[in-house]
Amino acid sequence: LFCFGPTHEEVITDIVRKEINSYKQLPINFYQIQTKFRDEIRPRFGVMRAREFLMKDSYSFHTDIDCLKNTYEKMYKTYSEIFEAIGLNFRAVQADNGAIGGDGSHEFHVLADSGEDELVYSEETDFAANSEVAKNHPDRDKLKKCRGIEVGHIFQLGTKYSEAMKAEFIDELGKPKPLLMGCYGIGVSRIVAAAIEQSHDEKGIIFPSSIAPFEVIL
């Protein structure tokens, strides 16, 4: 049986439950860069929303919530630094976990008028979220709006997958406990498309210098 993988939480959890059994082996973070496949109902805009695309994803495992949050913050900072190094005008926003589940997540959006997602933010505070999360914000009418292209997403999954798949570790007291999990993804193919949407003119593409194939074309 051969399956196309849209995402790999279950696959990684299955590997970890066979290989990790002690708190001494944690925390640990696995990552990969490979092709993903998703049954998009309406694939469009080239590699912006395709059924096949290149993605970097990673999955971290932890003994407790503080350990998970520490790694989550590191990944948030790392993703921000990656997008800054590329030269993208982006914003990290609070997001809904959706079908993946868990307790908290952030999306990273390249700002572009052609973006599929509506984002809202406050000019007075550091609040920023996608419009779905901001539905019940007390000052929603005062929030500014913009559009973005999602190029990254990070999640605190907690024990959603480990409990369902019985992925456990033995703690300091010799008792079995479910692993806590985080997952983190960057759409490698979509970054290129988003950079084009954000930076171009009537003559064509103006790539940020960090990802431009050439500095000068004659």
Role assignments for model-derived ranges:
Residues 1-218:
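TRNA-recognition modules of translation machinery and tRNA-sensing kinases, especially anticodon-binding
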